[in-house]
């Protein structure tokens, strides 16, 4: 029949018009609104500041409000990517704003890892969470910045429980918190998901590793991230590779990461054959 004939027949049966949903405004263009951007208004700008994992103390938030009053129109906005936005900054005030200490602390040009870092509130304030997320997310990000200073932009989202408030299923790397037994002790751990994205062609992330202890996570991600920057995410879509983390001797992260390395390379080769 085709879409138009089906729509006409359905409207006839329902005896009422079917209003179109409108224009799809989704796009694959990614913007966390972190940085310096021109506004539509002439000679006006907005500055997006990264607040690492969304945690900011009251005195510093008040300081941001004072900056908004001094350099803008007193307005501060918040984004889903854990950032603060100060809009309506005239050109002549922009340079002075960028020299403020708070702007240097909550920078508008974070590293490629910190830029895409998002975390749910974690066990500190949520009774559903199984692990602490915010401090761990910062710690892992800091270690990865040292290990991978030149990595391409990547999103890394932490969720402390299956409720998924950190949106781990739509990130390049999603981390889902859990507890595991290691020897005789119970420790914080994560399942690792990869390949999620939003936009015009959304995809849910694929779980590729299970039960990775948080205290060894940075060592694992050091070897995983290079395969999963945005340019290399798509080969693993649609396939599920689940591997249990196997504890072994210290310093063996390179051997352990091979649990997932071969499946990734295998699907990468298959993907390239289709091009």
Residue ranges and their predicted role:
Residues 1-275:
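Peripheral terminal and linker regions in Fe-S/redox and tRNA-modifying enzymes
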């Amino acid at each position: 029949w085709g879409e138009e004939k089906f729509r006409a027949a359905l409207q006839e049966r329902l005896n009422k018009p079917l209003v179109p949903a409108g224009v799809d405004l989704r796009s694959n263009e990614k913007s966390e609104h972190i940085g310096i951007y021109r506004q539509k208004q002439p000679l006006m700008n907005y500055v997006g500041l990264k607040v690492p994992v969304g945690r900011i103390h009251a005195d510093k938030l008040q300081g941001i409000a004072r900056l908004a009053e001094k350099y803008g129109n007193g307005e501060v906005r918040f984004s889903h990517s854990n950032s603060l936005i100060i809009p309506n900054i005239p050109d002549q005030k922009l340079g002075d704003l960028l020299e403020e200490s708070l702007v240097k602390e909550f920078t508008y040009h974070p590293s490629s890892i910190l830029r895409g870092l998002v975390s749910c509130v974690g066990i500190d304030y949520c009774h559903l969470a199984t692990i602490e997320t915010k401090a761990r997310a910062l710690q892992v990000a800091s270690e990865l910045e040292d290990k991978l200073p030149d990595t391409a932009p990547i999103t890394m989202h932490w969720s402390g429980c299956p409720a998924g408030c950190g949106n781990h299923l739509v990130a390049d790397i999603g981390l889902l918190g859990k507890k595991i037994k290691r020897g005789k002790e119970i420790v914080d751990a994560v399942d690792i998901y990869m390949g999620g994205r939003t936009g015009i062609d959304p995809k849910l992330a694929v779980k590729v590793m299970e039960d990775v202890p948080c205290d060894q996570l940075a060592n694992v991600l050091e070897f995983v991230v290079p395969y999963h920057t945005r340019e290399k995410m798509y080969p693993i879509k649609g396939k599920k590779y689940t591997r249990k983390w196997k504890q072994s001797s210290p310093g063996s992260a390179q051997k352990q990461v091979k649990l997932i390395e071969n499946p990734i390379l295998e699907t990468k080769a298959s993907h390239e054959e289709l091009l």
